[in-house]
């Protein structure tokens, strides 16, 4: 079937099971071929082909509402709703988004990117439906990994209490990105092996109704048998106790079983949870056999061999530099522990996990818990290293404020994927952390200019015992600089001059330092002398350095790959104002006040005007012509 000719999912209504099976093969082949060129979340989507087709066949989107939790598994949904022809632009600038996007299609009713939000949003839609007295189905699709998130559990509790009509699809592939962890994961494991609970329960109820009423004792005994059945079949029956009708487990690749169960769910009042067992990566052997999450999301790859197409790496990944330095220090200090919320592979903590399994803690998709747990460990003299992506640290903000900073606890937060991350787009750009951390009392915030300084700042963080400290580091690789053998502590709140200059100064840090250096060198050739400062401590700033610089009364430009509002540049402006430098000319470059879409980092930087050319032009406008050297 030519998938690019699909306009909407209505064509599925008249297709037979054998035709649907052929369509499944076509979609898997299409995904494997297309994603080999663009990269993307291949394994999650290969696992939900039949489930997605079944949902679109039995329900009527967009009247019926599908909410894809996390959203990385929505590619099949996009194909069935008329977007196959755009897959060549997947996750590229102004191309097809890798997650549901409301402006992209009327079938995308809820935007996602972070996990565990679908149930709360679905509850909101269902309550709105009931208030408006309409009849559409609301169907959140959530994975077993996302179900461990606290927000999802809060929603389950509320939905079950209110008995709201809703069909929750639990897509259980036993993984989130890496293998799942936790007690709920173990509950699901027991459910997988327990058989079809709801069918057996219905049969028993039918039999019990046939028992003649020969006395209260028999009736009471029969009722107890019925009430106790779930405990005989499944230990806990977690979802039934929460107020859901539990259906399953059902084979998520068997159309007959899917249709039977979903039709049953459509007729059932109140909240229903359909437990669907799927195989992540199904239909492509390299992805299907992956047990650690390598094929969860990938770049381009060779279909035949399963080898990834990667540019030759000339420098280590930032995540590896940080995690390996932490590991090196952990060998000499038993108090150091590593904590991750379900990202051991992305944060490059596999080596730490292998060497110190008892000191490496993966809490699952539970950022709030991870953060406060780290705080608790710090109260007992441990040295917790919390490795967390910038975008996911947003989810634990209150815990950082209330539990870590307020108590001034020695927690080292490794803020991975800081700055623009590219193809994953606006839900994943790490551009807000400076603004939401800089104003917190007791917080120290750093970002290195290169991987060598990065390892020294990790050492600095582990030696620091006066409160919380955080290190920002980018996605991707470092610069390939020489790495010192001996680690050293860098004095807190100190900056360094990278290039001397007399007519203007650029204050920056991290990934924008090469941009600033190149701009300064070009300006030098044009007769403009510009100082470049490595402001590696975003907080506390180097106040002595700032006093000296502001006293020279030369233009100052701050550059940051982070949002301008409340950012580093704002801090410099505040310092100048509060210290009486009222004639100081301080201008800022950074991320404007909007969400930044998906695309390559280079393209996105061009789009927002954060380039070497833009820096050169800005400095020229800041310096009067009469001050420029001939």
Swiss-Prot record:
GO terms for cellular component: cytosol. Mg(2+) binds at residues 144, 173. CDD domains: TPP_DXS, TPP_PYR_DXS_TK_like. GO terms for molecular function: 1-deoxy-D-xylulose-5-phosphate synthase activity; magnesium ion binding; thiamine pyrophosphate binding. Thiamine diphosphate binds at residues 72, 113-115, 145-146, 173, 284, 367. GO terms for biological process: 1-deoxy-D-xylulose 5-phosphate biosynthetic process; isopentenyl diphosphate biosynthetic process, methylerythritol 4-phosphate pathway; terpenoid biosynthetic process; thiamine biosynthetic process. SUPFAM superfamilies: Thiamin diphosphate-binding fold (THDP-binding), TK C-terminal domain-like. Binds 1 Mg(2+) ion per subunit. Binds 1 thiamine pyrophosphate per subunit. The keyword Transferase applies. The keyword Transferase applies. It catalyses: D-glyceraldehyde 3-phosphate + pyruvate + H(+) = 1-deoxy-D-xylulose 5-phosphate + CO2. Its EC number is 2.2.1.7. Pathway: Metabolic intermediate biosynthesis; 1-deoxy-D-xylulose 5-phosphate biosynthesis; 1-deoxy-D-xylulose 5-phosphate from D-glyceraldehyde 3-phosphate and pyruvate: step 1/1. It is an enzyme of class 2 (transferase). Keywords: Isoprene biosynthesis, Magnesium, Metal-binding, Thiamine biosynthesis, Thiamine pyrophosphate, Transferase. Its cofactor is Mg(2+); thiamine diphosphate. It comes from the Bacteria. PROSITE patterns: TRANSKETOLASE_1 (PS00801), TRANSKETOLASE_2 (PS00802). Belongs to the transketolase family. DXPS subfamily. Homodimer. Catalyzes the acyloin condensation reaction between C atoms 2 and 3 of pyruvate and glyceraldehyde 3-phosphate to yield 1-deoxy-D-xylulose-5-phosphate (DXP). This is 1-deoxy-D-xylulose-5-phosphate synthase. The gene is dxs.
């Amino acid at each position: 079937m030519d998938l690019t000719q699909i306009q909407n999912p209505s064509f599925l209504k008249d297709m037979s099971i054998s035709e649907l099976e052929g369509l499944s093969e076509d979609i898997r082949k299409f995904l494997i071929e297309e994603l080999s060129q663009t990269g993307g979340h291949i394994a999650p989507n290969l696992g939900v082909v039949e489930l997605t087709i079944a949902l679109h066949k039995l329900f009527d989107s967009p009247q019926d509402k599908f909410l894809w939790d996390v959203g990385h598994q929505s590619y099949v949904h996009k194909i069935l709703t008329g977007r196959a022809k755009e897959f060549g632009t997947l996750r590229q600038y102004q191309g097809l988004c890798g997650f549901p996007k409301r402006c992209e299609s009327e079938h995308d009713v809820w935007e996602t990117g972070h996990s565990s939000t679908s149930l709360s949003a679905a509850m909101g839609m269902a309550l709105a439906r009931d208030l408006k007295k309409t009849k559409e189905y609301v169907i959140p699709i959530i994975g077993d990994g996302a179900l461990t998130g606290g927000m999802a559990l809060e929603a389950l509790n509320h939905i079950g209490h209110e008995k709201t009509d809703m069909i929750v699809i639990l897509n259980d592939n036993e993984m989130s990105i890496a293998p799942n962890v936790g007690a709920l994961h173990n509950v699901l494991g027991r459910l997988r092996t327990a058989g079809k609970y709801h069918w057996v329960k219905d049969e028993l109820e039918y039999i019990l109704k046939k028992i003649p009423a020969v006395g209260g004792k028999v009736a009471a005994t029969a009722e107890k048998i019925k009430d106790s059945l779930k405990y005989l079949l499944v230990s806990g029956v977690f979802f039934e106790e929460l107020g859901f009708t539990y259906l399953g487990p059902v084979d998520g690749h068997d159309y007959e079983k899917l249709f039977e169960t979903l039709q049953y769910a459509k007729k059932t009042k109140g909240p229903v949870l359909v437990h669907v067992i799927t195989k992540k990566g199904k239909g492509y052997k390299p992805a299907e056999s992956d047990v650690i999450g390598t094929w969860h999301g990938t770049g381009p790859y060779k279909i035949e061999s399963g080898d990834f197409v990667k540019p030759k790496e000339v420098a280590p990944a930032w995540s590896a530099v940080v995690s390996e330095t932490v590991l090196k220090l952990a060998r000499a200090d038993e108090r150091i522990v590593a904590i991750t919320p379900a990202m051991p592979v992305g944060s490059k903590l596999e080596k730490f996990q292998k060497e110190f399994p008892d000191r490496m803690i993966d809490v699952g998709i539970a950022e709030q818990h991870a953060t406060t747990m780290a705080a608790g460990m710090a109260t007992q003299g441990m040295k917790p290293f919390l490795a967390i992506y910038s975008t996911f640290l947003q989810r634990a903000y209150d815990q950082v404020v209330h539990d870590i900073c307020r108590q001034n606890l020695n927690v080292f937060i490794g803020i991975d994927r800081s700055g623009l991350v590219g193809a994953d787009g606006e839900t994943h750009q790490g551009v807000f952390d400076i603004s939401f951390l800089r104003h917190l009392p007791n917080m120290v915030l750093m970002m290195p200019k290169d991987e060598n300084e990065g390892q020294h700042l990790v050492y600095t963080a582990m030696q620091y015992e006066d409160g919380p400290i955080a290190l920002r580091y980018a996605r991707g690789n470092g610069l390939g600089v020489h790495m010192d053998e001996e680690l050293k502590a860098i004095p807190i709140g100190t900056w360094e001059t990278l290039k001397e200059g007399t007519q203007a100064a650029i204050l920056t840090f991290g990934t924008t330092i090469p941009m600033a250096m190149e701009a300064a060198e070009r300006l030098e050739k044009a007769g403009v002398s510009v100082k470049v400062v490595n402001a590696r401590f975003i907080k506390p700033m180097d106040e002595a350095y700032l006093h000296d610089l502001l006293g020279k009364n030369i233009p100052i430009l701050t550059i940051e790959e982070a949002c301008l509002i409340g950012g580093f540049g704002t801090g410099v402006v505040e310092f100048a104002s509060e210290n009486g430098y009222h004639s100081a000319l301080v201008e800022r470059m950074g991320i404007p006040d909007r969400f930044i879409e998906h695309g390559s980092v280079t393209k996105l930087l061009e789009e927002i005007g954060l380039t070497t050319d833009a820096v050169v032009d800005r400095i020229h406008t800041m310096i009067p012509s009469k001050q420029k050297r001939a």
